[in-house]
């Protein structure tokens, strides 16, 4: 029986970092904790988390040959990475990035920005035309990233609603069998879509991948890359739109400044990305395994040890961000937050995510200056059973 602190920590607030996490951060950069699967090292301070994110000795796969306990989140990530072979993981990851990074070209992002702004205007029209209370999550937060990822992949309009529902179901870990089944539906659909694109290519990522290397990539390879685009760049943006709205509703003075000056939207987005943690912080922990001994302060992480990188806590660290828990649009040259990771695993879609969030928050409170929650904030439900967390609804009025 262990008496270690056990993740996830209770959090009385629906947003922000659990008090126990912050207490451990004050004590030191690293602590031993229990998890649902196995004991792990929890790293909470900014400098140490940033350093370890760039350390190639920390990987998703376990270097030990015996089966290891996996959290639901890690099991899903391993499945998406197509295996748990620690010897081939670096090469597979490098290949995936080399194929996907060119897909987010300046030309594509410029075109996507125009489309995204059009989508946001349409969705805000629908929101404004609805009789309150209306679910902002359903009308805006869920639909915009669905539209964007479907534009990227060339998903036909007729398929977009079910495609979005499958993607959501994949992240729901309350029923592992259901999650696995919906993930398989996504895989099957992606294979079907790739086959269609071979016959009728378009201006989308899948069509570009089909033409890559003179058509040498298999349908399975291309579908796998399409799944990565969908599942890594979709759900997290949904969550950030919800959290960003709530953060601004909590900060009326800065919300009013943003409504008056949409040029503040990029600064607002960076603070939303930095502080956007909800529930028990399940959406702000990165699980890894050590593939070599690593020293953190006076602690040695041994080969095979599980490590949890607390990017949420790191982004609240007062050592990196003075008054780190405060939402502040006027931060002067703030340090780079870790919401998109760092190093070799720095998020490929970070520029696109920023475009989406900026389009939302330079418009939302200008269009609906009286926007407010229609229910007490404490009644909102954070979905701990989802890999990325998130809310099931955000009822608002205006």
From Swiss-Prot:
Cofactor: heme
This protein's record includes keyword Lipid biosynthesis: no
Catalytic activity of the protein: pentalenolactone F + 2 reduced [2Fe-2S]-[ferredoxin] + O2 + 2 H(+) = pentalenolactone + 2 oxidized [2Fe-2S]-[ferredoxin] + 2 H2O
Binding-site list for heme: 347
Pathway linked to the protein: Antibiotic biosynthesis; pentalenolactone biosynthesis
Coiled coil region boundaries: none
Annotated knockout phenotype: Accumulation of the precursor pentalenolactone F and lack of production of pentalenolactone.
Pfam family name, one: p450
Keyword terms: Antibiotic biosynthesis, Heme, Iron, Metal-binding, Monooxygenase, Oxidoreductase
NCBIfam families assigned: PentlenlactSyn (NF045816)
Assigned protein family: Belongs to the cytochrome P450 family.
Function comment: Catalyzes the final step in the biosynthesis of the sesquiterpenoid antibiotic pentalenolactone by mediating the oxidative rearrangement of pentalenolactone F to pentalenolactone.
Name assigned to this protein: Pentalenolactone synthase
Species of provenance: Streptomyces arenae
Lineage per the UniProt record: Bacteria, Bacillati, Actinomycetota, Actinomycetes, Kitasatosporales
């Amino acid at each position: 029986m262990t008496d270690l602190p056990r993740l996830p920590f209770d959090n009385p607030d629906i947003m922000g970092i659990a008090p126990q996490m912050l207490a451990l951060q004050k004590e030191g950069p690293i602590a031993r904790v229990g998890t649902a699967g196995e004991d792990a090292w929890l790293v909470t301070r900014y400098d140490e988390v940033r350093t370890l994110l760039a350390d190639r000795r920390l990987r998703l796969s376990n270097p030990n040959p015996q089966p290891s306990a996996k959290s639901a989140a890690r099991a899903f990530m391993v499945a998406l990475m197509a295996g748990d072979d620690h010897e081939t993981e670096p090469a597979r990851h490098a290949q995936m990035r080399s194929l996907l990074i060119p897909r987010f070209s300046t030309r594509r992002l410029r075109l996507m920005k125009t489309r995204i702004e059009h989508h946001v205007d349409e969705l805000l029209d629908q929101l404004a035309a609805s009789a309150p209370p209306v679910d902002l999550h359903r009308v805006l937060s869920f639909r915009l990233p669905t539209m964007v990822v479907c534009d990227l992949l060339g998903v036909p309009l007729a398929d977009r609603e079910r495609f979005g529902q499958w993607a959501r179901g994949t992240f729901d870990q309350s029923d592992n069998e259901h999650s696995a089944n919906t993930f398989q539906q996504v895989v099957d659909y992606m294979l079907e879509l790739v086959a269609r694109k071979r016959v009728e290519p378009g201006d989308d990522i899948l069509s570009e991948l089909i033409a890559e290397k003179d058509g040498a990539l298999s349908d399975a390879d291309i579908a796998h890359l399409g799944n990565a685009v969908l599942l890594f760049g979709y759900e997290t943006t949904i969550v950030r739109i919800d959290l960003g709205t709530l953060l601004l509703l909590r900060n009326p003075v800065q919300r009013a400044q943003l409504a008056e000056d949409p040029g503040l939207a990029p600064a607002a987005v960076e603070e939303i990305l930095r502080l956007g943690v909800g529930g028990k912080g399940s959406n702000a922990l990165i699980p890894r395994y050590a593939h070599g001994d690593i020293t953190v302060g006076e602690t040695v992480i041994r080969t095979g040890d599980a490590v949890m990188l607390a990017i949420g806590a790191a982004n609240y660290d007062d050592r990196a961000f003075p008054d780190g828990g405060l939402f502040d649009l006027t931060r002067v040259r703030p340090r780079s937050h870790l919401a998109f990771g760092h190093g070799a695993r720095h998020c490929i879609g970070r520029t696109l995510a920023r475009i989406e969030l900026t389009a939302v928050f330079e418009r939302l409170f200008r269009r609906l200056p009286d926007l407010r929650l229609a229910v007490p904030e404490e009644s909102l439900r954070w979905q701990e059973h989802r890999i990325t967390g998130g809310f099931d609804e955000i009822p608002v009025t205006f």
